Amino acid sequence: MGFTEKQEALVNSSWELFKQNPGNSVLFYTIILEKAPAAKGMFSFLKDTAGVQDSPKLQSHAEKVFGMVRDSAVQLRATGGVVLGDATLGAIHIQKGVVDPHFVVVKEALLKTIKEVSGDKWSEELSTAWEVAYDALAAAIKKAMG
């Protein structure tokens, strides 16, 4: 069974909610560092800070991550697969030392953030839609990593 119109709509609506509050980006990175403190050095905008400090770069990167997952949902619905819009993503992830467990941490942080953002609109169906879209994006990035 492919990615459904309803799943795409669920991802789109919660993506819009995510973008409305800059604090959601801070929450996302706070969850990542709670799960994997050593990952701090992988993000240029966190390396030299105490904790997670809000910044334009942090906002931009979080929006890029969530936006790419949202784009994956759109692609899954349209074509059944995900093609990376940025061919350098594989190389960047290799350069930063990203390995499989990091994808799991980011996925958990993404799902927790979406749950928080969605409030009473959260459901297992919503979580599954984000999970499927993230997994497809992660697979495309891993493929680009070789």
From Swiss-Prot:
Keyword Protein biosynthesis: no
A Pfam family of this chain: Globin
Modified residues (Nitrated tyrosine): 29, 134
Occurrences of domain Globin (ranges): 2-146
Tissue: Root nodules.
KW Transport (keyword) present: yes
Keywords: Cytoplasm, Heme, Iron, Metal-binding, Nitration, Nitrogen fixation, Nodulation, Nucleus, Oxygen transport, Phosphoprotein, Transport
Cellular component, GO, one term: cytosol
Induction: Locally down-regulated by cadmium (Cd), thus leading to nodule inactivation and impaired biological nitrogen fixation (BNF). Down-regulated by nitric oxide (NO), particularly during nodulation mediated by S.meliloti inoculation.
Matches recorded under PROSITE patterns: GLOBIN, PLANT_GLOBIN
PTM comment, free text: Nitrated in effective nodules and particularly in hypoxic conditions; this mechanism may play a protective role in the symbiosis by buffering toxic peroxynitrite NO(2)(-). Nitration level decrease during nodule senescence. Phosphorylation at Ser-44 disrupts the molecular environment of its porphyrin ring oxygen binding pocket, thus leading to a reduced oxygen consumption and to the delivery of oxygen O(2) to symbiosomes.
InterPro entries documented for this protein: Globin, Globin-like_sf, Globin/Proto, Leghaemoglobin-like, Leghaemoglobin_Fe_BS
Annotated binding of heme b, by residue: 44, 64, 93, 96
Phosphoserine sites (modified residues): 44
GO terms assigned for molecular function: heme binding; metal ion binding; oxygen binding; oxygen carrier activity
Spans traversing the lipid bilayer: none
Gene3D superfamilies xref list: Globins
Compartment list: Cytoplasm, Cytosol; Nucleus
Binding site for O2: 61
Quaternary organization: Monomer.
Free-text function comment from the UniProt entry: Leghemoglobin that reversibly binds oxygen O(2) through a pentacoordinated heme iron. In root nodules, facilitates the diffusion of oxygen to the bacteroids while preventing the bacterial nitrogenase from being inactivated by buffering dioxygen, nitric oxide and carbon monoxide, and promoting the formation of reactive oxygen species (ROS, e.g. H(2)O(2)). This role is essential for symbiotic nitrogen fixation (SNF).
Protein name: Leghemoglobin 1
Organism annotation: Medicago truncatula (Barrel medic)
